[in-house]
Amino acid sequence: MSFVAGVIRRLDETVVNRIAAGEVIQRPANAIKEMTENCLDAKSTNIQVIVREGGLKLIQIQDNGTGIRKEDLDIVCERFTTSKLQTFEDLAMISTYGFRGEALASISHVAHVTITTKTADGKCAYRASYSDGKLQAPPKPCAGNQGTLITVEDLFYNIITRKKALKNPSEEYGKILEVVGRYSIHNSGISFSVKKQGETVSDVRTLPNATTVDNIRSIFGNAVSRELIEVGCEDKTLAFKMNGYISNANYSVKKCIFLLFINHRLVESAALKKAIEAVYAAYLPKNTHPFLYLILEISPQNVDVNVHPTKHEVHFLHEESILERVQQHIESKLLGSNSSRMYFTQTLLPGLAGPSGEAVKSTTGIASSSTSGSGDKVHAYQMVRTDSRDQKLDAFMQPVSRRLPSQPQDPVPGNRTEGSPEKAMQKDQEISELPAPMEAAADSASLERESVIGASEVVAPQRHPSSPGSSRKRHPEDSDVEMMENDSRKEMTAACYPRRRIINLTSVLSLQEEINDRGHETLREMLRNHTFVGCVNPQWALAQHQTKLYLLNTTKLSEELFYQILIYDFANFGVLRLPEPAPLFDFAMLALDSPESGWTEEDGPKEGLAEYIVEFLKKKAKMLADYFSVEIDEEGNLIGLPLLIDSYVPPLEGLPIFILRLATEVNWDEEECFESLSKECAVFYSIRKQYILEESALSGQQSDMPGSPSKPWKWTVEHIIYKAFRSHLLPPKHFTEDGNVLQLANLPDLCKVFERC
């Protein structure tokens, strides 16, 4: 059998270029890296990247750099054409990102490329299209800003195997974000943005005036930025300088985040990474890694940048000595970091099972299991030693001393029945004293609470929040207004009367559906079965659920509570009635005098604005009274406020600002009128720290009242507000993310730390 020698042929230039392009441009992220470096070489200060389908369908990168001269557009996409290098010796002193002239050429061999560019001295921009490195047609003049816009379409359209291998657009988009994010951190004086085509919000966005730490925070989050240590060292003997940021011993992740720039070029160094991680091994838990952002500036003649087609590797002289010097400096910075740790509370979903998946067992459950003979052993760290159904004695000791405006006195029977067909269900209630700002508006210092059931147009559907597992649903009635007899609600809201109006108004029903859709059942279960621990201050309180302790934002939760009551009990509120009318003009003047109003002389005289507010609210008086029980008479006096929860009166110090915001912040002419009005009412009724008097201000009046609580607002928070949370609040999902519900401790975790329970 004879073998015939193969014929050696010269490859076609197109084949050669396409093979080379496959080495340089391995995926969309490589193309964006090369073009981003071109933008930086062009002295750009604003770089915008838009992609579609992970960059496989479209890549668009725009800068405001120097642009490309019209004369150079003919050869800009040919191989080995560059403005940064002339002789081979220039490589020894190269300081730019590009030097071979292969990037645009390689991209044009595997995609359709269009370049639109304008120089500072050019009268107009020029657009040109390229394929296989060649100009398709003479450049055409067009409108454009200074800089360059490169559009890359159908990447790897002629390399089918490569395109099939890159079949996950989301993965490719993630790599694009990673590349641009790293360059944005290293170039803190330049604005970067990356977004998908058609999206309005950028996934990466940095500002030109942002610092390096700001950009790290924007890309990697606060968890990294607040644990950074600045590093820096220099060795003239080795001709190198190092600086950057590394994470301290408080921060660790499962995968090392290593940003390395050598002479401002993004590269990789497995040896340097291994050396630094060896230092961190003494400080971080096993199988966790640090965040590292290092900049090495080495004398250019000591660096060989022409090592790899993608330029992600470089070689340099004295590598071992430089790595050892960097390792020693980082070790000195971390020295002593192991002496302390800082722990941050994070928002956790209440009620989720622990890592072991073991169910939490209460003491009542222990008794039942022992009687049934199950024989299950319950560990101390699993026991729940409280019962949310237990009542406290002080729940029956409502404060009777001089109290805050938000604390009602004991009910006083009354005979008012106007507007209500059910006289037997009416109640009256007074408050001993209005706050100091109210004294200027009304000489009288008492409020009467009167249950008023109107009989007009649109009202709230019946709901049963106290029934376990119940959900709020809209009623299918055809008419906009109906009356319902024998409402089965027996809870705390003011609309608990035998006769109710039923709503079918689309705007209100949609708000109810929105509340249902954003509700979080796990949070609801926690609030329904919580055990109140105590108030930290008027804004924060502690509550226990099973074996976990939570810190709850009373202000935000009460605001959401009152908003939901206003929406679900729409037009079914009782009335807190002032026995003597309070002028709206005086309220408006008090509000405008407050810095919170933001009034300036440019807004005009306060008296004129106050008169406008009075006249405006008088026009809305009928709707306010019918739907929200905010009663205003013909003379412009406030005579009633809605009764949302039994035995609760809002902090009346906020009434002037509430009146002002009713006239200025509510979208009266928009479809969102009911929503914005309800939100303003909810803010007014919520527990707010600035309106709660301190104990020192009340000690003189309360010292002679034995048996009464020292701080009546605490009684209100525990026995009125948090009691209402159990049955009336469907907490939204965002409460698990925005810090309004924080898990502070978990009994099993505490037992691991202290080795006892």
From Swiss-Prot:
Comp. bias intervals (Low complexity): 362-375
Write the signal peptide boundaries: none
Residue numbers of N6-acetyllysine PTMs:
K33, K241, K361, K377
Q: Output compositional bias ranges, type Basic and acidic residues.
A: 419-430
Where does the record place the region Disordered? 355-378, 400-434, 456-487
Q: Where is this motif: Nuclear localization signal?
A: 473-476
Indicate which residues the UniProt annotation says bind ATP. N38, D63, T82, S83, K84, R100, G101, E102, A103, L104
UniProt record, GO biological process: DNA damage response; DNA repair; double-strand break repair via nonhomologous end joining; female meiosis chromosome segregation; homologous chromosome pairing at meiosis; homologous chromosome segregation; intrinsic apoptotic signaling pathway in response to DNA damage; isotype switching
Identify residues that carry Phosphoserine.
S479
Gene Ontology MF: a single term: chromatin binding
Gene Ontology CC annotation, any one:
synaptonemal complex
What post-translational events are described?
Acetylated. Deacetylated by HDAC6 which prevents the MutL alpha complex, formed by the MLH1-PMS2 heterodimer, from being recruited to the MutS alpha complex, formed by the MSH2-MSH6 heterodimer, leading to tolerance of DNA damage.
Give all N-acetylserine modified positions.
S2
Does this UniProt record's set of keywords contain Nucleus?
Answer: yes
| Coiled-coil residue spans | none
Enumerate the UniProt keywords alphabetically. Answer: Acetylation, ATP-binding, Cell cycle, Chromosome, DNA damage, DNA repair, Nucleotide-binding, Nucleus, Phosphoprotein
* Superkingdom, taxonomy of origin: Eukaryota
Q: Which Pfam families match?
A: DNA_mis_repair (PF01119), HATPase_c_3 (PF13589), Mlh1_C (PF16413)
The yes or no answer to whether the keyword DNA repair is present is yes
The segment annotated Interaction with EXO1 runs over: 412-652
Task: Describe the task this protein carries out.
Answer: Heterodimerizes with Pms2 to form MutL alpha, a component of the post-replicative DNA mismatch repair system (MMR). DNA repair is initiated by MutS alpha (Msh2-Msh6) or MutS beta (MSH2-MSH3) binding to a dsDNA mismatch, then MutL alpha is recruited to the heteroduplex. Assembly of the MutL-MutS-heteroduplex ternary complex in presence of RFC and PCNA is sufficient to activate endonuclease activity of Pms2. It introduces single-strand breaks near the mismatch and thus generates new entry points for the exonuclease EXO1 to degrade the strand containing the mismatch.
Q: Which family does it belong to?
A: Belongs to the DNA mismatch repair MutL/HexB family.
Q: How does it assemble?
A: Component of the DNA mismatch repair (MMR) complex composed at least of MSH2, MSH3, MSH6, PMS1 and MLH1. Heterodimer of MLH1 and PMS2 (MutL alpha), MLH1 and PMS1 (MutL beta) or MLH1 and MLH3 (MutL gamma). Forms a ternary complex with MutS alpha (MSH2-MSH6) or MutS beta (MSH2-MSH3). Part of the BRCA1-associated genome surveillance complex (BASC), which contains BRCA1, MSH2, MSH6, MLH1, ATM, BLM, PMS2 and the RAD50-MRE11-NBS1 protein complex. This association could be a dynamic process changing throughout the cell cycle and within subnuclear domains.
- How is this protein named in the record? DNA mismatch repair protein Mlh1
Question: What is the species of this protein?
Answer: Rattus norvegicus (Rat)
Q: What is the lineage of its organism?
A: Eukaryota, Metazoa, Chordata, Craniata, Vertebrata
